[in-house]
Amino acid sequence: METKAKNRFINSITLPHYEFTIKSPAFKKEGEEFTIWFLEGILEKNPNYVDCLMYLGNAYTAHGMYEKGLQIDQRLCSLRPKDPILYYNLACSHALLKNIDAAFDALEKAILLGYNDIHHLERDKDLTYLRKDVRYRKLVEKIKQH
């Protein structure tokens, strides 16, 4: 009986309507720019919030901020050193910055940790620059053997 009373109370709450204008330039951001600002704000209070870091890394990369994306990916790999997806993302960040040796090191680590999505690997535009290197085919063959 008490639960019904609580539910009835919650359903009958009416919040007041306020009209106001936010003049802060931060709230004038849109799209990826707003997303980045918002996620950075969350990380100020929770610097090791992995899901937030993952979204922020993706947002940086989508916005062409590859150096910042790389820093996030490195941080994520230190927080979760056994996650193959994080090393795959690290490889992508290095590849976008044309850090070829570092990209191959991270990609090899991802594969050693269990990354095996050849379909995605072969189509990922972030890795385009790596496909010209003989090491790329060797890593693909390594995945196929497992």
PLM features: residue spans?
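TPR/TPR-like alpha-solenoid helical repeat scaffolds
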Residues: 21-29, 117-142
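TPR/TPR-like (Sel1-like) alpha-helical repeat modules
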Residues: 101-118, 140-146
